[in-house]
Amino acid sequence: MVRDYVLARAEGQCEHCNEPAPFTTPHGRPYLEAHHIRRMTDGGPDDPRFVIALCPNCHRRAHFGHDATELNEDMLRHVAAVERE
């Protein structure tokens, strides 16, 4: 599952701000949210090259921030670099 892969790839850190997950889940896992940089509802793929693990604040910013478009483009470049490694 793409979500599980992306959360594991993040190793407990937000892939945008690099801060540790803000808390752990009841199962002891770091809490991060999978963000589809190209939204699936807009035809974006469910592919690790287009999904990033974010803390809740960065996730909200990616959707509702005044700089959301630029932020998502930066995230896309970051994920492309990580997936090439």
Region annotations inferred by a language model:
Residues 12, 32, 49, 53:
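Cys/His-enriched microdomains
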Residues 24-27, 35, 65-67:
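Short Cys/His-rich "knuckle" micro-motifs
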Residues 38-53, 61-85:
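Polybasic, low-complexity binding patches
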